[in-house]
């Protein structure tokens, strides 16, 4: 769901914005809600965030998932008065909050940063389109594999399997839009194939070989 290219661009911008406020969130916490005043840009230092849209009829849908190195809430830069979606953490997350004025100042004073940020936004929009296609046409097994790879940041160049301790099967089922029994079935399959490993304390280790499921 994320590419190394725009992840690096986001990191460059982040390094230039050191005066932001860092907030830490537990899983399932709302960072901002749809309809709230749109006044800050957010950058994910650590964690996974889902963007949720609620229709006028009250139906909700997940627009996409964001991981380390991603921005969200950037609509405030373009003059949007309210957030068009809600942002909710899926795992423990560390978020850098950048004031709108500071972000605009950075973009105006650093032309190359402006170019990088535009490229990032275009890449991010393309990824959200791919997420929607994924939900509409791909199997639950492939959606689960993509989410697990996102959790370990493999798509941003990380080569080593880290241990994920805060994601249960109910959360994974919510993330990919299926049931817990289906997630359990696929997780057992991934374990038998050596794509994932459960640690003695209940943590989950995800191996890059899981990407074979997406082929």
Language model: regions and residue ranges:
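Glycine- and acidic-residue-biased ligand/ion/polar-headgroup-sensing regions
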Residues: 39-52, 57, 67-69
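A cytosolic small-molecule/anion-sensing beta-strand core signal
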Residues: 26-27, 45-46, 67, 91, ...
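Cyclic-nucleotide recognition modules
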Residues: 12, 18, 64-126
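Regulatory nucleotide-sensing modules
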Residues: 4-46
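Local beta-strand/beta-hairpin segments that build beta-sheet-rich folds
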Residues: 31, 63-64
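Phosphate-/nucleic-acid-contacting segments
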Residues: 153-215
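Polybasic "coupling" helices that flank or enter modular domains
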Residues: 108-177
């Amino acid at each position: 769901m994320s590419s190394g290219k725009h992840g690096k661009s986001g990191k460059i911008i982040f390094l230039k914005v050191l005066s932001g406020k860092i907030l830490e969130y537990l899983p399932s916490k709302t960072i901002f809600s749809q309809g709230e005043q749109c006044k800050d840009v957010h950058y994910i230092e650590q964690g996974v965030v889902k963007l949720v849209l609620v229709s006028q009829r009250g139906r909700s849908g997940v627009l996409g998932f964001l991981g380390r190195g991603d921005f969200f809430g950037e609509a405030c830069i373009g003059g949007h008065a309210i957030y068009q979606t809600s942002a909710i953490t899926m795992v423990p997350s560390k978020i850098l909050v950048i004031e709108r004025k500071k972000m605009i100042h950075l973009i105006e004073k650093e032309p190359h940063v402006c170019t990088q940020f535009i490229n990032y936004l275009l890449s991010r929009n393309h990824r959200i389109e791919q997420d929607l296609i994924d939900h509409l046409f791909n199997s639950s097994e492939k959606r689960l594999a993509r989410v697990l790879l996102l959790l370990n940041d493999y798509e941003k160049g990380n080569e080593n399997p880290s241990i994920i301790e805060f994601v249960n099967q109910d959360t994974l089922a919510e993330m990919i839009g299926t049931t817990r029994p289906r997630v359990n079935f696929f997780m057992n399959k991934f374990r038998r194939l050596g794509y994932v490993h459960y640690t003695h304390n209940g943590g989950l280790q995800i191996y890059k070989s899981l990407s074979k499921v997406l082929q």
